[in-house]
Regions:
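Predominantly soluble domains enriched in secretory-pathway, periplasmic, or organellar proteins
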Residues: 1-191
């Protein structure tokens, strides 16, 4: 996690019966999120160090046995910026904005990764240009039945945010003002 300048860089393997650490898997600096897919792979995001180590997404196969760590990049070798991520079926949706002190610029993406092939399908699933109005993509969820994509825009992190809803095709369906830093979602269903 965030321990500047000596960032931790490992995922711990814990025996659930004894709750003892059995090992550590080196991944990258400043780890942030961890998800498991339906095939037992772990997906880990790194925030990088805001200088030379960029934010990135990693896949760990066989985490309890002989773990292999793969950095997930686009076809041209570019890292995905990952502030938050969520799974729906074989698709991992990732959002993020990364600031670099080296370039003094932000880099933003709205990616989809096929978790079976570990291939980046797109770095911008928003297809209607609405991404230009999102200041700070912070939270993401995908409706399990409709495939609608929800993005929480934290904007300035001190003022009200915005919740955007996109169709599975990446078209804006609606948006609404929220409280500060919209990041988490829950779906309730009628019985």
């Amino acid at each position: 996690g965030y321990m500047f300048p000596n960032y931790e860089n490992t995922v711990s393997v814990v025996d659930i019966g004894t709750f003892r650490e059995e090992g550590r898997i080196p991944v990258a600096v400043n780890l942030h999120h961890l998800l498991a897919d339906s095939d037992g792979r772990l997906w880990v995001s790194s925030r990088g160090d805001y200088y030379g180590n960029t934010s990135a997404l990693f896949c760990i196969t066989d985490p309890a046995g002989t773990p292999q760590v793969q950095r997930i990049t686009t076809q041209d070798g570019t890292d995905l910026v990952v502030e938050n991520m969520t799974l729906r079926g074989d698709s991992m949706y990732v959002i993020g904005t990364e600031f670099s002190y080296a370039t003094m610029q932000n880099h933003t993406n709205y990616g989809i990764v096929n978790v079976r092939t570990r291939q980046v399908l797109t770095t911008n699933f928003i297809t209607d240009g609405t991404d230009a109005s999102i200041m700070e993509p912070y939270g993401i969820a995908v409706h399990p039945h409709t495939g609608e994509i929800l993005i929480g825009d934290a904007r300035t992190h001190v003022n009200p945010g915005t919740l955007f809803c996109f169709s599975p095709e990446g078209l804006l369906l609606w948006k609404v003002r929220t409280g500060d830093i919209p990041a988490h979602f829950a779906f309730l269903y009628e019985r």
